């Protein structure tokens, strides 16, 4: 099933793995494209007709059912990794306006109220929560880089 998503997030994971998120305007929901075997790597960003970046409008062939994963990762959706094509890119102003149009009010609107602390970090237990992807326009945001070069973002919604 061909769907167009606007890329809203690209996250570096361990090694050269990445996680991407997109927003399906037609279905009005977030989608996290995932592979049936393995994880996406940085090469995915350069695999199609144009580089994938924030604001890219990407067409992928998703494998039904769309978003059949269990909470909180309800956005995880399998796709055919050889099907992609970048259709267009939002410019900076268009992307900012788009993000503002889909923003949630607060963390609880995205994740629900089941957030727990594990080793000092907020987590959602498997099977709990509304969803795992969302957008917040913060009142205050601080980015801290630790001694290992790892970045952490603290914010007030």
Task: Describe the role of every protein-language-model region.
Residues 1-60:
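N-terminal ordered "arm"
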Residues 56, 61-157:
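OB-fold/S1-family single-stranded nucleic acid-binding modules
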């Amino acid at each position: 099933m061909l769907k167009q998503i606007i890329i809203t997030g690209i996250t570096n994971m361990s090694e050269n793995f990445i996680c991407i998120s997109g927003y399906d305007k037609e279905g009005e929901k977030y989608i996290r494209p995932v592979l049936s075997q393995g994880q996406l790597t940085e090469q995915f960003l350069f695999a199609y007709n144009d580089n994938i970046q924030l604001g890219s409008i990407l067409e992928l062939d998703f494998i039904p059912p769309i978003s059949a994963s269990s909470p909180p990762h309800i956005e995880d959706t399998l796709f055919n990794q050889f099907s992609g094509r970048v259709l267009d890119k939002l410019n900076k102003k268009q992307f900012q306006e788009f993000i503002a149009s889909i923003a949630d009010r607060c963390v609880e609107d995205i994740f629900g109220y089941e957030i727990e602390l594990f080793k000092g970090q907020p987590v959602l237990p498997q099977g709990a929560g509304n969803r795992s992807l969302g957008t917040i326009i913060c009142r205050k945001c601080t980015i801290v880089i630790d001694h290992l070069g790892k970045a952490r973002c603290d914010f007030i919604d």
